[in-house]
Each structure stands twice: as structure tokens, then as C-alpha cells.
Amino acid sequence: MNEIRTKVQIVDIDEDMAGQRIDNFLRNQLKDVPKSMIYRIVRKGEVRVNKKRVKAEYKLAAGDVVRIPPVTLEKKDPETAPSTKLNKVAELQDLIIYEDDHLLVLNKPSGTAVHGGSGLKFGAIEALRALRPEARFLELVHRIDRDTSGILLVAKKRSALRHLQAQFREKTVQKYYFALVMGEWKNSCKVVNAPLLKNEVNSIVRVNPNGKPSETRFKVIEKFPQATLVQASPITGRTHQIRVHTQYSGHPIAWDDRYGDRRFDAYTAQHGLNRLFLHAANIRFTHPATEQPMEINAPMGEQLEKVVQSLRTSR
């Protein structure tokens, strides 16, 4: 069995690294090391902070000195790496629509999860880390559904992550989505205020008086014979919020496998659609370093553009 043994690392913690748990810090430093091994070396006291043992939940402070012990890993056979995974990683390079020293913005394709887990070994964040092996820090600022395409913010510094997530919590980030919904959305329907409750067993979200307050603002962009293209802006950030609010209003989104309408899906399939028509198209926020206002636009993609064009010609 071929094995690789890493070298001892001594890391001085600066302000940007401070505030995170030691286990999360080690997962970023030892990207190919299994989580179980990381927790084992912490538990055994092989990881030292300021020459002392620490627990996994220890939060790093500026000025700490971390000793990361050598670890032994099985050498992977490059021929066993699935080419489909490598192809997906390469494709994402062309979908990075903004990048600087503090953040990166990806125009995530539909069908790609934001991160691995729940049976998925591959996600957008894992792909970006593969594309940027030299990056010391890459973390998701927020999430969008697997089948939703569009803007995904990724922080390249911990300080940027804290700054951007604070903006999301304070609801100062403005997000705008395009959605193709069934039927004629009335111009007068500009706001949907309906509490949402998530079923923890099957993850289905429903409007429920016992749910969390949820608000989405809508604007009609274009009307077609049996569909409407709307702009949706979620004021709150609940799971599946836009998808459930459109369904609740009687206008489910095309190709929504949880909250949609099969007859409408069949109709839009005639116009070339075979995926959820929900796209995170625009985001506005404050840059975490310069404090300047930022506005990022993500094009819808060829398939969605062709569907809209086909619907226009069907009038």
C-alpha cells in the first residue's frame, strides 16, 4: 500500500483565522484527511495550541500557535479518479463570475449541490477548493437549493465570511431571482407574507400558522399564454421559500419536483425545459473589505433563455 506522510506544521494564528473552532481550522488545513482522523489526533493530544492540549470545540485566538502533527494517508491512484468529477470541476472554472482577494462569486449550475453530504461526495464548495488548492480558506457564505441555478457567494477570508454573514442576518443583502410560474401572475400580487414550517422528517415545507414568518416580494417581468416570468426577492431566508410561496399563491414554479404541477411541467417541456426554472440572477451587498456597494449579475444560461424565447414565439 502506498502511503504519504505529511510534515509537522506550525501555524501562527492571525486576526483572520481567529474565532473558528480548532476542528474546523484543521479540516481546512488538512483537506484530504478524514474527519475521523482529525478528531482522533485532537483527542489524543497530538494537536497542540500554545504547547497545550485542547478539545475539538476550542476557539482559536489571534496570537495562538498551533502545532499540527504529521499524519499518514493512503496514496490515491490517480487513475481511479472519476473523470466525470474532474469534468465538473473544470466546468465550474468558467462559471466564476467575480473574484478578488476576499470573495468569489459562482454562477452555480442547476443540479449541483452547494456542498457534499447526504450521499453526495461532490459539491460546489469541494470543486472550488480543488480549483483553488492554494487557497487557505474557502467557505460558503449562504446556500441555494441544488436544482436552483445562479449566484453563490464564497468567502476567501474568515473576516469576509463574518462580514457577509452579518449582512445576511441583518437582511441588508438584496437577492433577486427569476422564476417561471404557472398561469397568469396578477400584477397586484406584489408581496406574499405566509409563515413556513419545515417537516423535519421529509424536509417538505408548508405554509403553516405555527411556522416562521416569511416574506417574498414579486414583480411581473413578462407574461405568456400559460405562464409568467416573475422576479422574486426573498426578504427572509427560509428553506424553499420562493418555491412554497409561489405554490401557495396558486402559481408553482416550472419543474419543481416537490411543489410543482406535472401538467405545467409537460407544457414547458414542449418549450425545451427539463429543470427547475429558478435562477438567482442578481445580488447586492457591501464589500467586506472596501465597504463599497456591490452588485453582481448572473446570466440565466442558454437553456432558460431559449425557453423564454420559445414561449414568446408561442403567443
Curated annotation (Swiss-Prot):
SMART domains: S4. Its EC number is 5.4.99.24. Transmembrane segments: none annotated. InterPro entries: PsdUridine_synth_cat_dom_sf, PsdUridine_synth_RluA-like_CS, PsdUridine_synth_RluC/D, PsdUridine_synth_RsuA/RluA, RluA_PseudoU_synthase, S4_RNA-bd, S4_RNA-bd_sf. Belongs to the pseudouridine synthase RluA family. NCBIfam families: PRK11025.1, rluA_subfam. This is Ribosomal large subunit pseudouridine synthase C. It comes from Vibrio vulnificus (strain CMCP6). The lineage of its organism: Bacteria, Pseudomonadati, Pseudomonadota, Gammaproteobacteria, Vibrionales.
